[in-house]
Design a protein with these regions (language model features):
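A glycine/serine/threonine-rich, flexible loop-to-helix segment
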Residues: 124-125, 180-188
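Short, surface-exposed alpha-helical segments at coil->helix boundaries
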Residues: 38-41, 151, 187, 245, ...
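C-terminal substrate-binding subdomain of Rossmann-fold SDR/epimerase-dehydratase oxidoreductases
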Residues: 16, 55-56, 172, 191-310
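Short, conserved glycine- and acidic-residue-centered signature motifs
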Residues: 91, 146, 182-183, 274
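Residues that form or flank phosphate/diphosphate-binding pockets in enzymes
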Residues: 36, 63, 180, 242, ...
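Short, solvent-exposed loop/turn segments at secondary-structure boundaries
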Residues: 82-83, 177-182
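Nucleotide-sugar-dependent glycosyltransferase donor-binding/catalytic pocket residues
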Residues: 88, 178-179, 210-213
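N-terminal Rossmann-like NAD(P)+-binding domain of SDR-like oxidoreductases, especially those catalyzing
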Residues: 1-173, 215, 299, 303, ...
């Protein structure tokens, strides 16, 4: 098949492009390089089935494709708060433009949504039928609300225009090709540990997250697109739950770093806990993560070690 990946030069997008090529598909990678990087897909450029286009999804484009994976959007607080208007426009206008294309060329389209649609959840773990406990005017809202609007658009294009949609909600994902200045906790802790800097925990370290290794996540994407039973939304994440302090200690042990852990005030709007219920993914997609946190961290640490060596 001919597949389009928006945000294809980003962390997740580059891994998805790689997987789709390995599965025998033709791949068009679309990216504006706001957070995506050419180096993430440089190893794919000699592949005859791979095409790279510099384009911003807030502008319309028409391509003949069979499948669209809509991943384009800054996904770390540092990046989406740097330009919040651009962030929400990318989610909303990007969804409108990609759905319009899917409608015209009759392509199946997947929206990479997020666990952030649940806000600071009052239900734990989060199931897909939970509507969330959200702040529409906070500093993270440009990302959270943009993704919620995108889900609404996907459902309405499906109901009104019969567009063939799929929606996945991504929980915290980590792995090689994360940006070093990403601002997300896994990359922060690893880079700080490798540089011998203090490891910064915001709050008292008791807030929890669930960390899914990138290969597991991409497998979930592929299974979601390849089945005809459900359109979603479906939670894709690792239900193993860790506190920030547990993660910091694990990183210190694996890196052998002498870094100290320091505590700083928790930013506003930061969810206290986040963990997916993946019963639907297990049942409908026969999917669950296979890579434990320790193994995934080891692979990610090797990546950042190589990066820091230059």
């Amino acid at each position: 098949m001919r597949c389009l990946v928006t945000g294809g030069a980003g962390f997740l997008g580059s891994h998805l492009c790689e997987r789709l090529l390995n599965d025998g598909h033709e791949v068009i990678c679309l990216d504006n390089y706001f957070t995506g990087r050419m180096v993430n897909v440089a190893h794919l450029r000699d592949n005859r089935s791979f095409e790279l286009i510099r384009h911003d999804v807030t502008e319309p484009i028409l391509l003949e494709v069979d499948r669209i994976f809509n991943l384009a959007c800054p996904a770390s607080p540092i990046h989406y708060q740097f330009n919040p208007v651009k962030t929400i426009k990318t989610s909303v206008m990007g969804a409108i433009n990609m759905l319009g294309m899917a409608k015209r060329v009759k392509a199946r389209i997947l929206q990479a949504s997020t666990s952030e649609v649940y806000g600071d959840p009052a239900v734990h773990p989060q199931t897909e039928d939970y509507w969330g406990n959200v702040n529409p005017i906070g500093i993270r809202s440009c990302y959270d609300e943009g993704k919620r609007v995108a889900e609404t658009l996907f459902m309405d294009y499906h109901r009104q225009n019969n567009v063939d949609i799929r929606i996945v909600r991504i929980f915290n994902t980590y792995g090689p090709r994360m940006l070093m200045n990403d601002g997300r906790v896994v990359s922060n802790f690893i880079v700080q540990a490798l540089k011998g800097e203090d490891i910064t925990i915001y709050g008292d370290g008791s807030q929890t997250r669930s960390f899914c290794y990138v290969d597991d996540l991409i497998e979930g994407f592929v299974r979601m697109m390849n089945q005809d039973k459900i359109i979603g939304p479906v939670n894709i994440g690792n239900p193993g739950e860790f506190t920030m302090l547990e993660l910091a200690k694990e990183v210190l042990e694996l890196t052998g770093s002498k870094s100290k852990i320091v505590y700083k005030p928790l930013p506003g709007d930061d969810p206290k806990m986040r963990r997916p219920n993946i019963d639907l993914a297990k049942k409908a997609l026969d999917w669950e993560p296979t890579i434990p946190l320790r193994q995934g961290l080891e692979k990610t640490i090797v990546y950042f070690e190589d990066l820091l060596k230059g």
